Amino acid sequence: METMQLDDTELRETAKQLYESYSTVLSESKLASILQDALGDFAPVLDSKYAARKTINNLVMGYYPNEATIKANFIDKVLFPLNPANISIFELPIGNSRVDMCKVNGHSAAYEIKTDLDTFDRLDGQMSDYFDVFETVYVVTSEKRWQELPSYVPDACGIYSYRQDARDGSYHFKAQRRAIKSTDLDSEKQLMVMPKRALCETFGISGKGMSKPAIVQECLAENGQAKINRLFKAYLKQRYGAYWEHFCKVKPQVFGIDYEWFYRNRLEPGIVY
């Protein structure tokens, strides 16, 4: 590819620019124009149906290690090869936070991604929210930063590090510390994740004329922590199972830069690409 005539610094800047201009729903001709504007004389010949989209994806995935890039690689290398019965969820709101990825089956796990573009300043609040709701919690960060994490996260928090191979741009993940399963979950916070209708259906409450907080209090009064945790996990699987199932089906046809978009929208790649 002629873009390799650019040095690494130029490629990183170009990849950042392309990511900021990119949208999954843009046409191939529009993407070709964006690519031409960014690369100028270094733009490659676009001689196939998805050439512009593929080139942008490859540059972003290889030279701009932001959250979307790391998340896509973490899915490919860590989450996807696990038990196929696991349901993974993108960007789930929890308390005052939004967890980057979580998975649920027999047990629940949260994964917070901190790239080299991020600070660790928000981890205190995020960890508080995640440990209240999920049985295990992990933070994913770069190989050069992971040893700083123990100062920011509880001892029970697991740690994954990632590094990028300088030869081919591929990412490699390593479990640096195993998460310890939490036994002190906040049932009220779990219930608040669920919408009012799901609470009523799951716990057999009519809910008529009741506010959501009142329904939550009734659930707490009539059910123990273990049962609420079990039903909370069952709700997540039921609510997001179709999203993950569709994503798994279309994943081989989808570029990494578009993973989250196709997960959320559940469309066929042929309609968009």
Regions found by a protein language model. Name each.
Residues M1-Y64:
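Interdomain/boundary linker segments immediately adjacent to catalytic/signaling cores
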Residues I56-G62, N73-F74, V78, A179-K181, ...:
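Eukaryotic low-complexity, intrinsically disordered regulatory segments enriched in serine, proline
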Residues G62, N66-N105, V153:
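Active-site metal-binding core of divalent-cation-utilizing nuclease and nuclease-like domains
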Residues E91, Y162-D165:
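Conserved beta-strand termini and adjacent loop/short-helix elements that scaffold enzyme active sites
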Residues M101-K103, H107-L117:
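Conserved catalytic cores of phosphodiester-cleaving nucleases, focusing on short active-site segments
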Residues L117-R163:
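Catalytic cores of nucleic-acid endonucleases
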Residues D168-Y240:
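A conserved mid-domain beta-alpha-beta active-site/ligand-binding segment of alpha/beta enzyme cores
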Residues A226-Y273:
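C-terminal, charge/polar-rich interaction regions
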